[in-house]
C-alpha cells in the first residue's frame, strides 16, 4: 500500500500547481513510497497512543504534555523537504552530475534569529560528496551584501586524524538585499574507501558590504570587505541514517552483532531536558531514527525505554535501545546503546550525542 500522508501531500502539490505545464504529465505514483502492512499498523498504534483516551483516574496536577507529532506526519514532511532539495540541487549545473541525494539533514540554525545576518544550514549527502547549503538573510536596512561566500573548514571529530573531506568549490550568492534571502553552496568530496566519517565545520561568512545611495536607491559602486563568524556545524553519525519501520524491534536489535565494531554504548546526563518526554523528543531528533512500538510516548515520569530503528544510506540496519531514568536530584539520565550492521557506524551515532 502507499504511504497515505505522502500521497496526500503529492496530490495537493499536483492539483494546486500554478503552472499549467504540471498537468501536461500524469501524476507520478512512483514518487510515493510504498509501506508494508507492519508500517501501517505501527502508525495506527502511534495514533492511538498519542490520542487522549478516557480514564477513571482523577486528573493530575501540573501542565499537560504536548501531543506528540505523528511519525506519519513527520515522514511526509521529511519526504516533501527531501524532494524539494533534490529538485533544487539537480537544477544547479555544478551539482547535477552528483547523482541522487542520499539524505538531506534538518535545518540547523547557525545564528540567532535577531542578528544582522541570519544563517541556517542544511547538509546534503551524496554518494561521493557532501554539499552544505547555507541560507542567508541580510537584515540590515539600506545595505546590500555582494559576493557572499562562506569559508567552511572541516576538521575530524578526532583531532588526531584528518577529516578526509576535500573542498572542491563554493557557489557564492551574488547579491543579498535587505530581507531578501540568498544561498551559498560549499561542496566537499568524501574520502575514498570511507563510507562514514564525522567532522566539525567552522564557518565564517565573507562578503562586500555596500550602502544604498539614497539619491538613486542603488548600491554604491565601492564597498568594504567584511566577515562575520557564525556557529560551527557538525557532520555526525545520524546524518547517514534514514528512519525506517520494523515489526519486531527486539528481533532486529538482537540480530545485529554486539562486538566493539558494531555496538557502542554511552551513559550521560541530559542537562537540556527537564522531563523524560523532553528527553525522548530530543533523542529521536538527535539519533535520526524511527521510534517503534509506540515508544515515543512516555507513560511514566520516572523511567522509560525508547526503541529506535533506521537504515544507513547504504542499506545497513541500525537500531538503538535507550533507557532513561528521572529523579528530582539528578535530572534525566540516559543509557544509549546503538548497534549497526556496518562497522563503526554505531560509534559515530553515539558520538554525535555524547
Where are these predicted regions, by residue range?
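Acidic, serine/threonine-rich low-complexity intrinsically disordered linkers/hinges in large eukaryotic
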Residues: 1-120, 129, 239, 252
Amino acid at each position: 500500500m502507499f504511504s497515505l500522508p505522502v500521497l496526500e501531500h503529492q496530490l495537493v502539490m499536483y492539483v494546486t500547481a500554478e503552472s499549467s505545464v504540471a498537468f501536461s504529465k500524469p501524476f507520478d505514483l512512483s514518487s510515493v513510497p510504498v509501506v508494508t502492512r507492519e508500517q501501517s499498523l505501527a502508525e495506527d498504534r502511534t495514533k492511538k497512543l498519542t490520542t487522549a483516551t478516557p480514564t477513571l483516574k482523577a486528573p493530575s496536577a501540573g501542565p499537560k504534555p504536548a501531543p506528540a507529532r505523528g511519525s506519519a506526519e513527520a515522514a511526509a514532511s521529511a519526504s516533501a523537504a527531501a524532494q524539494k532539495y533534490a529538485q533544487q540541487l539537480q537544477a544547479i549545473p555544478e551539482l547535477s552530475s552528483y547523482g541522487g541525494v542520499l539524505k538531506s539533514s534538518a535545518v540547523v540554525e547557525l545564528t540567532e534569529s535577531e542578528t544582522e545576518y541570519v544563517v541556517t544550514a542544511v547538509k546534503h549527502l551524496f554518494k561521493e560528496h557532501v554539499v552544505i547549503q547555507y541560507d542567508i538573510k541580510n537584515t540590515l536596512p539600506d545595505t546590500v551584501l555582494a559576493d557572499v561566500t562562506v569559508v567552511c573548514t572541516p576538521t575530524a571529530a578526532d583531532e588526531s586524524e584528518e577529516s578526509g573531506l576535500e573542498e572542491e568549490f563554493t557557489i557564492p550568492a551574488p547579491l543579498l538585499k535587505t530581507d531578501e534571502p540568498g544561498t551559498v553552496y560549499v561542496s566537499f568530496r568524501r574520502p575514498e574507501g570511507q563510507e562514514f566519517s564525522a567532522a566539525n565545520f567552522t564557518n565564517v561568512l565573507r562578503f562586500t558590504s555596500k550602502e544604498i545611495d539614497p539619491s538613486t536607491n542603488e548600491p554604491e559602486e565601492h564597498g568594504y570587505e567584511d566577515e562575520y563568524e557564525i556557529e560551527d556545524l557538525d557532520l555526525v553519525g545520524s546524518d547517514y541514517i534514514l528512519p525506517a519501520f520494523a515489526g519486531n524491534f527486539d528481533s532486529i536489535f538482537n540480530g545485529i552483532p554486539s562486538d566493539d565494531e558494531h555496538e557502542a554504548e554511552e551513559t550521560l546526563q541530559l542537562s537540556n531536558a527537564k522531563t523524560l518526554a523532553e528527553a525522548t523528543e530530543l533523542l529521536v531528533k538527535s539519533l535520526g531514527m524511527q521510534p517503534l512500538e509506540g515508544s515515543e510516548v512516555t507513560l511514566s515520569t520516572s523511567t522509560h525505554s525508547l526503541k529506535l530503528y533506521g537504515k544507513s544510506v547504504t542499506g545497513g540496519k541500525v537500531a538503538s535501545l535507550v533507557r532513561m531514568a528521572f529523579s528530582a536530584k539528578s535530572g534525566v539520565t540516559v543509557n544509549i546503546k546503538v548497534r549497526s550492521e556496518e562497522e563503526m557506524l554505531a560509534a559515530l551515532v553515539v558520538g554525535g550525542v555524547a
